[in-house]
UniProtKB/Swiss-Prot annotation:
UniProt catalytic activity: 2 reduced [2Fe-2S]-[ferredoxin] + NADP(+) + H(+) = 2 oxidized [2Fe-2S]-[ferredoxin] + NADPH
Protein name (database record): Ferredoxin--NADP reductase
EC numbers, comma separated: 1.18.1.2
HAMAP family: FENR2
Gene3D superfamilies reported in the protein's UniProt record: FAD/NAD(P)-binding domain
InterPro entries: FAD/NAD-bd_sf, FAD/NAD-binding_dom, Fd--NADP_Rdtase_type_2, Ferredoxin-NADP_redctase_2
Names of the cofactor(s): FAD
Subunit annotation: Homodimer.
Amino acid sequence: MTDYTTDIAVIGAGPVGIFTVFQAGMLKMQCCVIDALTEVGGQCTALYPEKPIYDIPGYPIVSGKELIDNLKKQSEPFNPQYLLGQIAEKIEDYSDYFLIRTSKGIVIQSKVIVIAAGAGAFGPNRPPIDNILDYENKSVFYQVKNISDFHNKNIMIAGGGDSAADWAVELSKIASQLYIVHRRRNFRCAPNTALQIDNLSQNGKINVIVPYQIKKLLGEEGKLHSVVVQNITNHEEITLQVDYLFPFFGTSANLGSMLNWGIEIKGYQMTVDFETCRTSRDRIYAVGDIATYPGKVKLILTGFSEAAMACHHIYHIVYPNSPLNFQYSTSKGIPNKN
C-alpha cells in the first residue's frame, strides 16, 4: 500500500532540500520531503538558528532561522509534503519508480530520489552524565532556538569547540551569569573568538572554568538549580548555581541505510556527475554537502545551484514526452500562482 505518490522524494529538509522543492515546483514537479529531525531546516535549525550567515547571495547577514523561514515561504506555493522525525530505511526499484519505506512504516512512491542529507542523519553527542535525560528539553539543551528565553539566567556551556565558544560570547550579552566549562585550558575555536572569551573573562562577563568537567546535575522535576563540576587534575569539586546547561560536544552523523542503496560513496559523500548531480545509480541524485565531484566547494549557495541543475535534468524523467523550454522566473512567474 502506498501512502504518498510524488514526482521527487527529497531526503533531507535542510536549506538545499527545501530549495529543491522550489526548483522542482518551478518545473511543475511535486516533492515529498523526508527528514530525521522533527523540524525542517537541518543544521540551520538544529545547530545555529540564531547564528549569523554571511555568504548567502542577497543577504549581507541572515540567521539560520530566517534563512529557513524564507526558503519555506518560497516553496509553499508548491505544497510539499514533509515527513519529519523519520528516516528513509529502504528503497525498492520498480524500473520507472521507487517505493521508499520510512522508519515509521510510511511508503512513498516516487519517480526520482534527490538526496540532500548533508552529512546524513545526525544528533548531538550526549555527555555521560547521570540523569541528564531527566533535564533534557527542560533545562538542558543542545541548541539555542530563541536567545531571549535565557535573558538574565545563569547559564553553563560545556565544551571547547567553535559552537561552545561562539555561544558563550553571544549568551554572555544577555545572561546573568555565564560559565563555560572545558577539560583543557585552551579552546579549539577561531583565534578571534578565543580572544573575545579572554576579554569577556577579564571583564567579568564570562566565568571560564578550566580544566573541569561536569560531575553531577542537581534539581527537581527537570528544572536545574545547580551543577557540580570537578577538576580533572586534583578532583576538586565546585557547585555552581545554574538555570540552563548547554553541552556543546559536537554532533555525530551517519548515512545509515543509504550505505546499502548501491550508490558510489567516497568518504561519506556521494560521487555525482557535476553537470547533472546524478549519482552512480539511475534516477537517484545528490545535492548539497553530501554530493562530491572534482572542484566541489561546500557552501550552501553551491547546493542551491546543484538543486537547480538536478531538477532540470530530472524534468526529462518526469515528463519524457514534453520538451523543457527554459524560461527565467521573471517571465513565467510562480506556476501555481498563475
